[in-house]
Amino acid sequence: MQNKFSLPTQDEIVKRLKKIPEGLWRECSNCHEKFYYRRAGVYEVCPNCGYGARLGSRKRIKLLCDEFEEWDKAMATDPTNIDDEKYKKKLATGIKTTHVNESVLTGKAKIGNNEFAIGVMDSRFIMGSLGQVTGSKIARMFQEATRQHLPVIMFTASGGARMQDGIHSLMQMARVSDEVARHSAEGLLYIAVITDPTTGGVTASYAMQADIIISEPKTLIGFAGRRVIEQTINQKPPKDFQQAETLLKNGFLDDIVERPNLKEYLNNLLNLHSDK
């Protein structure tokens, strides 16, 4: 009987591989395990270690909020005032990738019966850097939340101050911090949800000024980068350095919440602090 099966040639294997759609298999950036993309689910969480992949601001709001009304949608960095061509290209790429005008999306949202102001930073937009317009949008969000007597939930994700904006970027730390203080003085709740990565000036200001500070698992949280610290102290920090779990253990965080549980967790906090 003639064998009908024959091994494919190298050329045939290459042709077959080209027909396989891209993105079916993913590699976790935390544990580096490979897995079939559907196993991550709608929340984009690694099935092996529980690390949540970096989400865009619009997707995060879609997963979290029952209703959302965007504020300051038209606010954006004006490219005509920029001489740096590389910066212009980065802005254009950020807008194309994220479908937002800046590294933060702000607005009024609702979970269940609870209304609140929300800000979501997008690490895909120039690494979520804190630029002049970013700071303006966040400051205006706190101002409007104070005016409407709303709690604030802020999702941070940032590489720090935006170098291209110079001193104007650094000024946003003080500007936003001032509005956080005004909001707090009115007895209003501020919850910070720190997501991967949150570093630099954002960590040094409004990310750590909230009444309740929580984080997703295995989030990188710090000020200076690991390499800078190593060069400064001439020592290698431990592996768990600048990890959310280490910060929780040392009292810098109030809790670590897995992404699929965030909506219910935040709704419970809003219920507990509601004045209705």
From Swiss-Prot:
Its cofactor is Zn(2+). Its EC number is 2.1.3.15. Binds 1 zinc ion per subunit. Keywords: ATP-binding, Cytoplasm, Fatty acid biosynthesis, Fatty acid metabolism, Lipid biosynthesis, Lipid metabolism, Metal-binding, Nucleotide-binding, Transferase, Zinc, Zinc-finger. It catalyses: N(6)-carboxybiotinyl-L-lysyl-[protein] + acetyl-CoA = N(6)-biotinyl-L-lysyl-[protein] + malonyl-CoA. Residues 24-276 form the CoA carboxyltransferase N-terminal domain. GO terms for biological process: fatty acid biosynthetic process; malonyl-CoA biosynthetic process. The keyword Isomerase does not apply. A zinc finger (C4-type) spans 28-49. Zn(2+) binds at residues 28, 31, 46, 49. Its main location: cytoplasm. Pfam families: Carboxyl_trans. GO terms for cellular component: acetyl-CoA carboxylase complex. Acetyl-CoA carboxylase is a heterohexamer composed of biotin carboxyl carrier protein (AccB), biotin carboxylase (AccC) and two subunits each of ACCase subunit alpha (AccA) and ACCase subunit beta (AccD). Component of the acetyl coenzyme A carboxylase (ACC) complex. Biotin carboxylase (BC) catalyzes the carboxylation of biotin on its carrier protein (BCCP) and then the CO(2) group is transferred by the transcarboxylase to acetyl-CoA to form malonyl-CoA. HAMAP family: AcetylCoA_CT_beta. This is Acetyl-coenzyme A carboxylase carboxyl transferase subunit beta. The lineage of its organism: Bacteria, Bacillati, Bacillota, Bacilli, Lactobacillales. The gene is accD.
